[in-house]
Amino acid sequence: MTVITIAKRGLPKLTTSTSSTTTASSSSTITSVASSSSSLPLLSNSTSSSIIPSITPPSRNGNPYILDSGDMPNGTVFIVVGGIAGVIFLAILLWWVITTYSSHRLTRSVQDYESKMFSAQHTQFYGDSPYMDYPAKENFQDQVHISESDISPGNKDESVKDALVSHTNNEKPFLSNFERPLSSLVSESNRNSLFISPTGDILYKTRLSKLYQESPRLLQKPVIMTSDNVSTNSLVSTISSSSASSLDNGNEKEVGEDIRKPAKIASSPSRKLLNSPESDGSVNRNHSKGNLLVVQSKRKPTPSTYLEHMLEGKEQDE
């Protein structure tokens, strides 16, 4: 390989020469100096050539430090790194799909369970209240109420058997206190809404806790015999039976005061009359005459009366 090098052009040089001439005369001496300058450009060109050898890599034969990549395609490293990154991305995507699907199934199952639990057939509620879809008095209106004192020990087992048989044979089973539906405070439509009523939630939890606390007592309530021979256990039956027996004994005023003042129930004369043998005999005589049908009031009870009825039922249980 030949390399041509061009040298710089030479700069012009300045040459200065000085000559002096002296002439002597009698009058004066004149000295003249003549200067002359001459400059010629000097141009010089030089060429040089050199040979540079090409680089030859060492042979791979017998050299352990050189990777033999003859069988591998170009960009092998990029292909390996991209494959690893793709596998990681696909694993994350698959995990996300599985998690989303399982969460969706769990949410649907919980939603279906809650919709069934909050439906009218599975909602548990205690007693009569203005928050119910229909008042509890409709279930106990025009029915025959029999108190515990009116039922002899021998007839209790038979009445329980009759109640079980009538419950299984009846096409439309009666609704117990644990099966009364709530109103629209907690319904399926509200559960599907984003709005949640704190008051309704608190009321529901409070009533549910009362249900769990009062469930042993409700199982020991007296039997109610309806006109269709359907028997139920209810807190309202205890209240109505005590009211009916007190009405038969001519104690309407005392019972009304006892209902409004639950603290005086234990010492009320109507309670003593109910527990006395004379009152039992009079009640039996009145029932034998056909005065077993008690029609409850059409007026809807207030919340305070509802709570007082609950307290009265507890006192009568004890």
Swiss-Prot record:
Record's compositionally biased regions (Basic and acidic residues): 250-261, 309-318
Membrane topology: Single-pass membrane protein
Residues in cross-link Glycyl lysine isopeptide (Lys-Gly) (interchain with G-Cter in ubiquitin): K314
Assigned keywords, A-Z: Isopeptide bond, Membrane, Phosphoprotein, Transmembrane, Transmembrane helix, Ubl conjugation
KW Ubl conjugation (keyword) present: yes
Region ranges (Disordered): 238-318
UniProt biased composition (Polar residues): 276-285
Biased composition (Low complexity): 238-247
Record localization: Membrane
Keyword Acetylation appears in the UniProt entry: no
InterPro entries xref list: PRM
Annotated Gene Ontology cellular component terms: cellular bud neck; fungal-type vacuole; membrane
Residues modified as Phosphoserine: S129, S279, S282, S288
Alphabetized PANTHER family for the sequence: CHITIN SYNTHASE 3 COMPLEX PROTEIN CSI2-RELATED (PTHR36089:SF1)
Protein family (similarity comment): Belongs to the PRM5 family.
Name of the protein in its database record: Pheromone-regulated membrane protein 5
Organism of origin: Saccharomyces cerevisiae (strain Lalvin EC1118 / Prise de mousse)
Lineage: Eukaryota, Fungi, Dikarya, Ascomycota, Saccharomycotina
